[in-house]
C-alpha cells in the first residue's frame, strides 16, 4: 500500500516522504525517515512519528491514493486542515461517534509546527488525568484531533473530496482528490491506480 500511495503522489508532481519504523522495507526512490517507536498501537506510533518528523505538509495514511495535485490546499490560510466527516456514525451502543471524532486522522495538513507535538502532549495529559492508557485506543488520534485543532486556525475540508472512502471496484471517484481504502477497501486499491 505505501508504494501505491507514493506512486500516486509522484504522478501529481511531488516527491513523497515515507515515515516508518525501523523494520519496514523502504520505498525505492522515496525519501524515508525511520523512527524507533515500539508498541502495538499503530495509531499511537503514527502520532509519535508525525510529531517527531514535524514538517509543514500533508500527512496521509498509507492506505490512501492521491488523485489530484494537493498544492491548492497548502495555499490556504490555516494552521491545520482536516477532513470533516459529513455523516453520522453511531456505534452499537447508540453513541454518536461523529460528535466525538468529527475528523478523520487519515488526512492531516499542517503549517503550524506546534500542532503535531501538541496532539501527543494532549494524549499524555488526558491519560494522566483520567488514569487510562489512551495510547492503546485505536481512535486516540481522532479523539485528540477535535480537541487540539479547535484551538488553532482550522480549515475543514469535505471528506467526500479529500478523504473519500472506497470499498469496491468501479466506484465513481471523479470528484475526489484523495481516496481512502479503509478496512476491506484495501483489497481494491490496486484497481484505482
Language-model features, listed with the residues they occupy:
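A structural signal for well-ordered alpha-helical segments within the folded catalytic domains
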Residues: 3, 7, 44, 48, ...
Amino acid at each position: 500500500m505505501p508504494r501505491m500511495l507514493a506512486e500516486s503522489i509522484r504522478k501529481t508532481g511531488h516527491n513523497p516522504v515515507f515515515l516508518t519504523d525501523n523494520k519496514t522495507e523502504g520505498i525505492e526512490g522515496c525519501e524515508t525517515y525511520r523512527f524507533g517507536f515500539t508498541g502495538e498501537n499503530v495509531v499511537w506510533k503514527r502520532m509519535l512519528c508525525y510529531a517527531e518528523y514535524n514538517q509543514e505538509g500533508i500527512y496521509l495514511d498509507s492506505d490512501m491514493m492521491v488523485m489530484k495535485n494537493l498544492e491548492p490546499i497548502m495555499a490556504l490560510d490555516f494552521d491545520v486542515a482536516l477532513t470533516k466527516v459529513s455523516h453520522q456514525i453511531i456505534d452499537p451502543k447508540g453513541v454518536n461517534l461523529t460528535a466525538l471524532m468529527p475528523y478523520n486522522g487519515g488526512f492531516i495538513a499542517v503549517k503550524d509546527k506546534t500542532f503535531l507535538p501538541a496532539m501527543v502532549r494532549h494524549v499524555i495529559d488526558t491519560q494522566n488525568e483520567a488514569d487510562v492508557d489512551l495510547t492503546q485506543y485505536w481512535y486516540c488520534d481522532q479523539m485528540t484531533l477535535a480537541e487540539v485543532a479547535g484551538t488553532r486556525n482550522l480549515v475543514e475540508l469535505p471528506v467526500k473530496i479529500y478523504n473519500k472512502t472506497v470499498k469496491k471496484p468501479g466506484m465513481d471517484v471523479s470528484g475526489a482528490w484523495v481516496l481512502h481504502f479503509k478496512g476491506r477497501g484495501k483489497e481494491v486499491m490496486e484497481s484505482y491506480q
